[in-house]
């Protein structure tokens, strides 16, 4: 009896898979370098939450030292530059791009440790040095608790937005069997890191708003937020290497206190793990243990900012080429997270004796940044192979360079009407061209416009002088000397008269 072979046959892909190559394969670097720097970038707000007006508009934003700062740096189009050397590239077959070869992220303000907390923090017992066995949390055992967070310094650079990961609420296989009080299912999610997102503070990277219903398990600045951690694995595996040229990271944390949570323990301790206690030890105490983090000492010896960073070789295939004339600089610095306490009197003049009710206390947090870059001008020769490769990576790049890929010829029969203004037929006018939207319009970034801040005079800027020094290049003199040249030895001496030759008579 004949039987069908059940082994699957795998066919090759219909078209060959393009090999991802480094940008060094098709980008030629020139000897022209430019400096670009931002103005002093300042932001200030409330460190725990945003303040809103009665109509819902934000009056004071949330500005915390434990937020990501994602700068979207916009660069000028080098193809529209007025270059003195017209033989640098052929505008018919070549295009110019920027390569970032140096960056320095400057941070202002003094070092300091910020404190966060919750006036209704879910703290049941001190399980590190307990004086008595727990007798139960009662109806409401929340307390006013504050702490300092994990210490993080981070700098990431790429030409597309960074990607973060966190644990979120997933979808169960059988939603009909889920009842109230069941443990939520978890799912690892990845999203774009936006400006203002919270970093990992020591309580894990997770969606606290969806996974903690009591809003009391973490401090105020986290209880309704999502804490994201950079997806280093995902960005390192990106084929073209656009999202992460390099990163510089420093993290440290230790545990300060050990507590347990109040509330019914969802996963009871199995009875085979303990022997039932006597009076005073029943019922068993809560076993949801947790710790409060601390970042410990902050010192200038461990700073990664206010230092030049040179890009010799990126970790991915993109070796610092700024496709789309933009850069994304992601910064985290919790070593300058001091919260400013402000006080205002409610009466004038200030009454005496002192009374707490005569003063209002406020919290604010301010941050100061400065971005400096060194860019190198590069040339891309657009032959058929390179154009096909770039089109597969990002088709909008060729559109920005006024190149288009011709669509394949259509084999279907098209309709063509004779009288285009005939009222008996539908309108035959061509649809207006669609305006291309910003692909990152729905994300929130800190825009930094450097289109008019480029300069080829590198020695006029601190980062430019550092670049010239490490490259072994010395700037020439700008002013010609006005001193007269010293006279030569022959001209300074007295003129010598030749002696008369004696002649015989």
From Swiss-Prot:
Q: Per UniProt, which keywords does this protein have?
A: Capsid protein, Disulfide bond, Host nucleus, Host-virus interaction, Late protein, T=7 icosahedral capsid protein, Viral attachment to host cell, Viral penetration into host cytoplasm, Virion, Virus endocytosis by host, Virus entry into host cell
User: What InterPro entries does the annotation carry?
Assistant: Capsid_L1_Papillomavir, Capsid_L1_sf_Papillomavir, dsDNA_vir_gr_I_capsid
Q: Where in the cell is it found?
A: Virion; Host nucleus
Cellular component (GO) terms are:
host cell nucleus; T=7 icosahedral viral capsid
Q: Does the keyword Aminoacyl-tRNA synthetase apply?
A: no
* GO-annotated molecular function: structural molecule activity
- Assembly description: Self-assembles into homopentamers. The capsid has an icosahedral symmetry and consists of 72 capsomers, with each capsomer being a pentamer of L1. Interacts with the minor capsid protein L2; this interaction is necessary for viral genome encapsidation. Interacts with protein E2; this interaction enhances E2-dependent replication and transcription activation.
**Full protein name:** Major capsid protein L1
Q: Which organism is it from?
A: Human papillomavirus 40
């Amino acid at each position: 009896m004949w039987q069908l072979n059940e082994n699957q046959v795998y066919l090759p892909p219909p078209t060959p898979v393009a090999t991802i190559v480094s940008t060094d394969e098709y980008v030629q670097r020139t000897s022209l370098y430019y400096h670009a720097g931002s103005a002093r970038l300042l932001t200030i707000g409330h460190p725990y939450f945003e303040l809103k007006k009665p109509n819902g508009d934000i009056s004071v934003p949330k500005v915390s030292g434990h937020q990501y700062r994602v700068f979207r740096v916009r660069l000028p189009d080098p193809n529209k530059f007025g270059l003195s050397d017209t033989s640098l590239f052929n505008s018919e077959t070549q295009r110019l791009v920027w390569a970032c070869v140096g960056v320095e992220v400057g941070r202002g303000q003094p070092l300091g440790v910020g404190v966060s907390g919750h006036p209704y923090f879910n703290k049941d017992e001190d399980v590190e040095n307990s004086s008595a066995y727990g007798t139960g949390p009662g109806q409401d055992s929340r307390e006013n608790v504050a702490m300092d967070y994990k210490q993080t310094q981070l700098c990431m650079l790429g030409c597309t937005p960074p990607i973060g990961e966190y644990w979120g609420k997933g979808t169960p296989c059988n939603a009909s069997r889920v009842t109230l009080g069941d443990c939520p299912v978890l799912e690892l999610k990845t999203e774009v890191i936006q400006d203002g997102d919270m970093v990992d503070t020591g309580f894990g990277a997770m969606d606290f708003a969806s996974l903690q219903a009591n809003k009391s398990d973490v401090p105020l600045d986290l209880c309704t937020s999502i804490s994201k951690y950079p997806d280093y694995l995902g960005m390192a595996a990106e084929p073209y290497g656009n999202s992460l040229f390099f990163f510089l990271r420093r993290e440290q944390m230790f545990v300060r206190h050990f507590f347990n949570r109040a509330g019914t323990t969802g996963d009871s301790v199995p009875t085979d793990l303990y022997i039932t206690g006597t009076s005073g030890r029943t019922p068993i105490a809560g076993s949801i243990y947790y710790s409060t983090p601390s970042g410990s000492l902050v010192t200038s010896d461990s700073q990664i900012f206010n230092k030049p960073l040179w890009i010799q070789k990126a970790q991915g295939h993109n070796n610092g080429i700024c496709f789309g004339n933009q850069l994304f600089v992601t910064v985290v610095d919790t070593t300058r997270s001091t919260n400013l306490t402000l006080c205002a009197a409610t009466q004038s003049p200030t009454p005496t004796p002192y009374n707490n009710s005569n003063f209002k206390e406020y919290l604010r947090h301010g941050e100061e940044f400065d971005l400096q870059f060194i860019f190198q001008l590069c040339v891309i020769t657009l032959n058929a192979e390179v154009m096909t490769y770039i089109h597969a990576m990002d088709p909008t790049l060729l559109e920005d360079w006024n190149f288009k890929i011709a669509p394949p010829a259509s084999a279907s029969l098209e309709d063509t009407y004779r009288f285009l203004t005939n009222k008996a037929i539908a309108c035959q006018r061509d649809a207006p061209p669609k305006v291309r939207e910003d692909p990152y319009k729905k994300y929130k970034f800190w825009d930094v416009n450097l289109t008019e801040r480029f300069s080829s005079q590198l020695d006029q800027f601190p980062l430019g002088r550092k670049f010239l020094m490490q490259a072994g290049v010395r700037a020439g003199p700008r002013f010609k000397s006005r001193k007269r040249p010293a006279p030569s030895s022959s001209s300074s001496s007295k003129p010598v008269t030749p002696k008369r030759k004696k002649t015989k008579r």
